[in-house]
Amino acid sequence: MSMIKLLKNTLKDPKKIMRALEFAPSFVFGKIYLSIFGINPLKVHNFGKIHIRKYDSSTIIIKSGILLRDVEIAARGNGKIIIGENFHCEPYVRLNVFEEGILEIGDNCGIGSFSIINATKKITIGSNVLISSHVHIIDGDHGFKKGELIRNQKMVSEPIEIGDDVWIGTGVKILKGVKIGEGAVIGAGSVVTRDIPPYSVAVGVPARVIKKRE
């Protein structure tokens, strides 16, 4: 059934109208919201609320086959967000870029609930990457030189690169300047502060390689 026929049939039945209105805040308004920000709503399957904040000269590019649930996507300054095909995002995920920051996510990636990605410099995530829930990927932190309030100091940022086919476990924190090689696995609760070689399994605080994938 075409969208036009569906709408006509719905408008003829008051009960159908009431049911449609119940879902309007999450589904219909989500489609309208995407359209306002220049994103083709037909490319996105949305469930729940979608918050997109696009400021100044920022750019948000979303490819096809995307599944979003209660997600917040925000691009500030001249920031850029590029999301590849078949991206699945669980509820309460936040994707943020600041200033000149860039966030690039490859194809066939998934992010679990309550995860946060903040890019001030550049965060690159390859294809076929699995990111579990409550993961934080942040490419910057505050300067903390003595003699000046930390809150007044500039951010110190370094790019993060995550290769293809990486699995990041629940509650992992990935900090600035880190490169995680293709096929690596990061165990739950780890804090990644240094590079992880390809096809390595790393765990702990800070994360250390304990073995290679076989």
Swiss-Prot record:
Q: Which InterPro entries match?
A: Hexapep, Hexapep_transf_CS, Hexapeptide_acetyltransf, Trimer_LpxA-like_sf
Keywords from UniProt, A to Z, are: Acyltransferase, Repeat, Transferase
Q: Which PROSITE patterns match?
A: HEXAPEP_TRANSFERASES
Record-listed E.C. numbers: 2.3.1.-
Enzyme class comes to: transferase
An example of a Pfam family matching this protein is: Hexapep
A GO molecular-function term, please?
acyltransferase activity
The lineage's top-level taxon is Archaea
Which family does this protein fall into?
Answer: Belongs to the transferase hexapeptide repeat family.
Which named protein is this?
Uncharacterized acetyltransferase MJ1064
Give the species.
Methanocaldococcus jannaschii (strain ATCC 43067 / DSM 2661 / JAL-1 / JCM 10045 / NBRC 100440) (Methanococcus jannaschii)
